[in-house]
C-alpha cells in the first residue's frame, strides 16, 4: 500500500468514530454482506460513516492490507478494526457490538 493511500485511510478513521468500508453506501448497498452490515448498524440507531470502496480502486485494495482482512465490508470503531459482516452479526447477537458502541458514545 502506498503512503498516500494509507494516509487517506488514517484520515477517514480519524475523522469518523464509526466507519464502514463497504460496497455501495448505506442507502444502496451493492452486495448482501454490505447490506447485512448496514442493517445491523441501522438497528443500533447510531451515526456512522460509510466509504464506498467500489468508487476507489486504491482504497479497495489497500483496506484489505491495512486490516489484514481479505473481505469487504469492514467495520472500524474508534480506529479499531472490528470485522466483517459475519463478525458484526455475531457481536450484535451477543450484545458485544452494542456494548462497544455504547462505550464509544460515553466518551
UniProtKB/Swiss-Prot annotation:
Gene3D superfamilies: Glutaredoxin (3.40.30.10). It is found in: Plastid, Chloroplast. Disulfide bonds: none annotated. GO terms for cellular component: chloroplast; mitochondrion. Residues 6-107 form the Glutaredoxin domain. [2Fe-2S] cluster binds at residue 31. Its main location: plastid. Keywords: 2Fe-2S, Chloroplast, Iron, Iron-sulfur, Metal-binding, Plastid, Redox-active center. Glutathione binds at residues 23, 60, 85-86. This is Uncharacterized monothiol glutaredoxin ycf64. One of its GO terms (molecular function) is 2 iron, 2 sulfur cluster binding. The keyword Transmembrane helix does not apply. InterPro entries: Glutaredoxin, GRX_PICOT-like, Monothiol_GRX, Monothiol_GRX-rel, Thioredoxin-like_sf. Signal peptide: none annotated. The keyword Transcription does not apply. Belongs to the glutaredoxin family. Monothiol subfamily.
Amino acid at each position: 500500500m502506498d503512503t498516500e493511500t494509507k494516509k487517506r485511510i488514517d484520515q477517514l478513521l480519524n475523522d469518523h468514530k464509526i466507519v464502514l468500508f463497504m460496497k455501495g453506501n448505506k442507502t444502496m448497498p451493492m452486495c448482501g454482506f454490505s447490506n447485512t452490515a448496514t442493517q445491523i448498524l441501522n438497528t443500533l440507531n447510531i451515526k456512522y460513516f460509510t466509504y464506498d470502496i467500489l468508487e476507489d480502486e486504491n482504497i479497495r485494495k489497500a483496506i484489505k492490507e491495512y486490516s489484514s482482512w481479505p473481505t469487504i465490508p469492514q467495520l472500524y470503531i474508534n480506529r479499531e478494526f472490528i470485522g466483517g459482516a459475519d463478525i458484526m452479526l455475531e457481536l450484535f447477537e451477543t450484545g458485544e457490538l452494542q456494548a462497544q458502541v455504547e462505550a464509544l458514545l460515553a466518551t
